[in-house]
């Protein structure tokens, strides 16, 4: 089989350590949420998010709902959008710097230089994805990607979401390789016709290797498995 022409990558547990998301990003958003909402309550984007939250739970304080969703690690679009706005402020004022595995950064650069089309699909908002790759400890990686997708296109465990991504990118399903650490996401992508590879990174507390999908410990191994350029 020919090497993939496009890569669709997850972030958490794939390009970026799970610990960075759960021990740095989430606590930062939670600690700063009340102050951010108070400071930016008149901002149009913030007001729209709050209206969406309040429409789901009328009469309940939006902050209470948002913090509850955070405690549940809910993949809900208005929460993810607000987190993205809070993180934007943190990245821009120097309080945050994203962590990206060196092997991921090196491979993504090599694949981009070789002409592969690179895309991101994460439960975090598109803005949060762009910020993470812009303010990474491996330099600005954001311009390597031709597109970013979040839960507005659908849930990551639903095959139709990957079909929508294929339609949006104009790629053929079998020409796109999806990289993730989560078996259910890989199952959905495979059901939509994409090629798949599970990242099983040592010490990252991701899922165990699956039987249905090829797996690799890092992006260098992915490159060898699928005949892709490697650093």
UniProtKB/Swiss-Prot annotation:
Its cofactor is Mg(2+). One of its GO terms (molecular function) is magnesium ion binding. It comes from the Bacteria. Keywords: Amino-acid biosynthesis, Hydrolase, Magnesium, Metal-binding, Methionine biosynthesis. Monomer. HAMAP family: Salvage_MtnC. This is Enolase-phosphatase E1. It comes from Granulibacter bethesdensis (strain ATCC BAA-1260 / CGDNIH1). The gene is mtnC.
